[in-house]
C-alpha cells in the first residue's frame, strides 16, 4: 500500500497538484490485540494475527523510514475526521482491501463517508475482497459506493461486485 500511495502521490505532483495522504488510523487495524477483536476474529485468527504482527515489525520499520518522503495530513481516527472533511477538492480512496468488511471491520471511513457534500470522491485500485459481501452489508455497500464520482478497482471480480451492487461498471 505504501508504494502505491507513494507512486500516486508522485504522479499527482507531476501534474501540478499538491496531494496529501490522509493519515487515517483505523483502530481495528492499528490495535489488533484488543480483547474486543478476539470475539470478532475468533481465537485462531487472533493468534495467527498476533504472530503475523510480530513478524511484520521489521517491515513496518522500513515503511516508516519510507513515509518520511511522503506528505501526510495530521493523524485522524474514525469519528474525528473533521480536520480533513472539507480540506481537499478531491478525495481518493485506494489500495489494498480497503472495502473488505472482514479486514476493516466494515469501517466506512474507507468509503469516504466523512467527506463534505460537493467534494469529489474517487477510488484508485481499491479492492473489495474476493466475494460479494453478505446480504446484511449489501445495502450499505450500495449506498456508500453510489456516492463516488469515479470508481477504479484493482481486480475484475471487484468490478463485477461493484457493478452488482450499484448497477454501474467501474
Task: List PLM regions with ranges.
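Secondary-structure boundary/capping signal
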Residues: 16, 132, 149, 169-170
Amino acid at each position: 500500500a505504501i508504494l502505491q500511495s507513494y507512486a500516486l502521490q508522485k504522479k499527482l505532483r507531476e501534474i501540478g497538484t499538491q496531494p496529501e495522504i490522509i493519515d487515517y488510523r483505523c483502530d481495528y487495524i492499528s490495535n489488533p490485540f484488543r480483547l474486543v477483536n478476539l470475539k470478532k476474529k475468533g481465537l485462531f485468527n487472533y493468534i495467527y494475527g498476533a504472530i503475523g504482527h510480530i513478524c511484520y515489525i521489521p517491515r513496518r520499520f522500513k515503511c516508516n523510514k519510507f513515509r518520511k518522503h511522503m506528505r501526510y495530513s495530521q493523524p485522524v481516527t474514525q469519528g474525528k475526521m473533521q480536520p480533513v472533511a472539507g480540506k481537499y477538492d478531491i478525495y481518493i480512496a485506494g489500495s489494498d482491501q480497503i472495502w473488505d468488511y472482514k479486514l476493516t471491520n466494515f469501517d466506512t471511513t474507507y468509503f469516504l463517508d466523512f467527506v463534505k457534500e460537493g467534494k469529489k470522491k474517487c477510488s484508485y485500485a481499491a479492492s473489495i475482497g474476493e466475494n460479494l459481501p453478505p446480504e446484511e452489508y449489501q445495502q450499505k455497500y450500495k449506498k456508500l459506493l453510489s456516492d463516488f464520482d469515479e470508481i477504479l478497482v484493482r481486480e475484475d471480480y471487484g468490478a463485477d461486485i461493484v457493478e452488482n451492487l450499484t448497477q454501474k461498471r467501474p
